[in-house]
Amino acid sequence: MFQRNTVYRWLFSTNAKDIGTLYLVFSIFAGMIGTAFSVLIRFELAGPGVQYLYGDHQLYNVIITAHAFIMIFFLVMPAMLGGFGNYFVPIMIGAPDMAFPRLNNISFWLLPPSLILLVGSAFVEQGAGTGWTVYPPLSSIGFHSGGSVDLAIFSLHLAGISSMLGSINFITTILNMRAPGMTMHKLPLFVWSILITAILLLLSLPVLAGAITMLLTDRNLNTTFYDPAGGGDPVLYQHLFWFFGHPEVYIIIIPGFGIISQVISTFSRKPIFGYLGMVYAMASIGILGFIVWSHHMYTVGLDVDTRAYFTAATMIIAVPTGIKIFSWLATLYGGNILYRTPAYFALGFLFLFTIGGVTGVMLANASLDVALHDTYYVVAHFHYVLSMGAVFALFAGFYYWIGKITGKQYNEFWGQVHFWTMFIGVNVTFFPMHFLGLNGMPRRIPDYPDAFTQWNVISSFGSIISIVSTIVFLYGLYLTLSQPAVSLANNYWHVPSFFSSTHSLYGDTTQTSSSLEWVLPSPPAFHAFNHLPVQS
């Protein structure tokens, strides 16, 4: 009987917290696969010439393609949106569950088949060695003749459907299921970030679906959408892909903004500085994200006027981003800061995300980008905002909320060891890439001239440090989950909530908090609210 109940609970779950837990477990599993791929990349690049991959350039490209897809679609998005989003959005707005609980279930269960298809694509024929952009003509039937690219396309379709359904669910939930008195301008910033992200997904994913479906018919049904021989244009694919691809990078980072806002507010023991400005900054970033896509295509032969516009528009995004950075700093300023692991990750996020943003402003210049496009400078830039922005935000959220999710508090010592090893590791890995890029080392090539050896060796050494940090994290997770259940306080950070601009009442208790999750037990009951909470 136990077995059947367990199977029913986890396979057919309609409970947002259980589904959020499934997403988190899935993303940790996928993240380990993606990390393994990244280590293969760095080991191959540890020296010039052939190291590990038999001089097989196709295999190298299959690995970087899989690394990108897994890290984006199966680590960051499931963890932030699926994991923390499903777990905390209903709790934070005082809703009993998501609006469509069964839709929520299939949103999760579309992801494992998608991951299997993606990993499977690497094992048939020569693999999909296209890079995550899947540009034709390289991805066309002439240059990738097997079924690999088709499997990767189906994988993307499934992951896309999953995200779309999840987004519909989030938008409906946040707009319609808030507790009495919980107006939009009283929502926690994390809920706002999930709402904005869901809208971006809903608007951008259909364009990607159309682009890769046309690629599928080009490959299998002899259409010529991207083939000049039949009146098509491969640049059309680039426009369609990046119209999705650029909002996608904001889809990755905006939930991170939301997490960082919650964490910085708690550990500064102050309300966030400029709440409304933070909301409108996130919304502005979301809108601007849709009108800058061609900055990925400066080298493709666009009109000079077009390039001038995209340069200007891209730089405008730095303004709302700067508003967020300085509002976080203003929150910290004069705060009675509590130095715990989540706070370290949040401070690391601020510093490293800012570096990534500055290199982004450089790359926004069309004239300079002609020199830096497709070099390691670009790799350094987006790994600073992803590997040290999104992932640091993820870990901040993990250490911040793990006690709330499991009822067991993490080990502070190993948490801080994890932070410092990871902080050192990722910087040693990615900072030298700026120098390689400025010297013209191209991306996506497994071999390089001897002159580039020094920085590559340092970079590969950094990836070993990062691996150690990942092992420390997994050990800390093991320590957390294997300890006996402690009676963890509802508000276990003990941050006084009198400063909060949004006091929440639940029942006749006098507990109030900056957001509603801290008035519930740790872990919350299977059905969190027996009666409606009220927002004062």
Swiss-Prot record:
Enzyme type, top EC level: translocase
Region forming the signal peptide: none
GO terms, molecular function: cytochrome-c oxidase activity; heme binding; metal ion binding
PROSITE patterns named in the record: COX1, COX1_CUB
Pathway per the UniProt entry: Energy metabolism; oxidative phosphorylation
Subunit description: Component of the cytochrome c oxidase (complex IV, CIV), a multisubunit enzyme composed of a catalytic core of 3 subunits and several supernumerary subunits. The complex exists as a monomer or a dimer and forms supercomplexes (SCs) in the inner mitochondrial membrane with ubiquinol-cytochrome c oxidoreductase (cytochrome b-c1 complex, complex III, CIII).
GO CC field: mitochondrial inner membrane; respiratory chain complex IV
Cofactors demanded by this protein: heme; Cu cation
Cross-link (1'-histidyl-3'-tyrosine (His-Tyr)): H246-Y250
Predominant subcellular localization, coarse grouping: mitochondrion
Binding site for Ca(2+): E44, G49, P446
Gene behind the chain: COX1
Binding site for Cu cation: H246, H295, H296
Catalysed reaction, written as an equation: 4 Fe(II)-[cytochrome c] + O2 + 8 H(+)(in) = 4 Fe(III)-[cytochrome c] + 2 H2O + 4 H(+)(out)
Family according to the record: Belongs to the heme-copper respiratory oxidase family.
Enzyme Commission number(s) of this protein: 7.1.1.9
Binding site for heme a3: H381
Organism: Allomyces macrogynus
Residues binding Mg(2+), per UniProt: H373, D374
Taxonomic superkingdom: Eukaryota
Name by which UniProt lists this protein: Cytochrome c oxidase subunit 1
CDD domains assigned to the protein according to its UniProt record, in alphabetical order: Cyt_c_Oxidase_I (cd01663)
Subcellular location: Mitochondrion inner membrane
Binding-site residues, O2: Y250
